[in-house]
């Protein structure tokens, strides 16, 4: 099997084990196309993986993720692993995890929900992680994966 050759990053974050085809969505929801620090963003798509068969990898130079950003990744790519890189070495590694309660990172798909009209933080309860299903705290609308991804 051919070896994947991608340059190492000195400081930043590597998001690994993203399901194949979801890497662009990860870049989009994190707003990595508008990085202000001048750091590179690298996307490797459809890379061979022992765990997933095929996977995507995102490398972000000079950026470390917030808890909110990690939670967003979990909604798009629940199998992802986040690696924190300092001085070219992995100093921290963890799997993303879908939280039981999601606040402030997802919009309700119900156009009549109070979250669209009042100054309240959208809040959802995770009903199921596989397949992903959430319920709005305010209007009780249930959303499944496709609608969740459209409302991130």
From Swiss-Prot:
Any one GO molecular-function label of the UniProt entry: metal ion binding
InterPro entries in the cross-refs: Asp_carbamoyltransf_reg_N, Asp_carbamoylTrfase_reg, Asp_carbamoyltrfase_reg_C, Asp_carbatrfase_reg_C_sf, Asp_carbatrfase_reg_N_sf
Keywords attached to this entry: Metal-binding, Pyrimidine biosynthesis, Zinc
Co-factor remark: Binds 1 zinc ion per subunit.
Statement: the UniProt record of this protein carries the keyword Metal-binding: yes
One GO BP: pyrimidine nucleotide biosynthetic process
Annotated binding of Zn(2+), by residue: 108, 113, 136, 139
Keyword Metal-binding: yes
GO cellular component, one term: aspartate carbamoyltransferase complex
Coiled coil: none
Cofactor field: Zn(2+)
Stated family: Belongs to the PyrI family.
NCBIfam families the record matches: ATCase_reg (TIGR00240)
Description of how the protein assembles with itself and partners: Contains catalytic and regulatory chains.
HAMAP family assigned: Asp_carb_tr_reg
Biological function: Involved in allosteric regulation of aspartate carbamoyltransferase.
Protein name: Aspartate carbamoyltransferase regulatory chain
Organism of origin: Pyrococcus furiosus (strain ATCC 43587 / DSM 3638 / JCM 8422 / Vc1)
Gene giving rise to this polypeptide: pyrI
């Amino acid at each position: 099997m051919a070896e994947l050759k991608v340059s190492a990053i000195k400081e930043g974050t590597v998001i690994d084990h993203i399901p194949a085809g979801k890497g662009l969505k990860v870049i989009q929801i994190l707003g990595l196309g508008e990085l202000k620090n001048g750091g590179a963003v690298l996307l490797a798509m459809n890379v061979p993986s022992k765990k997933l068969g095929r996977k995507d990898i995102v490398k972000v130079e000079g950026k470390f993720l917030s808890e909110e950003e990690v939670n967003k990744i979990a909604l798009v790519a629940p199998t992802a692993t986040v690696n924190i890189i300092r001085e070219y070495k992995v100093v921290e590694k963890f799997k993303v995890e879908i939280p039981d309660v999601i606040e402030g990172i997802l919009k309700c798909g119900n156009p009549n929900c109070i979250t669209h009209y009042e100054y309240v933080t959208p809040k959802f309860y995770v009903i199921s992680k596989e397949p992903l299903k959430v319920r709005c705290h305010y209007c009780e609308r249930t959303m499944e994966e496709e609608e969740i991804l459209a409302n991130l």
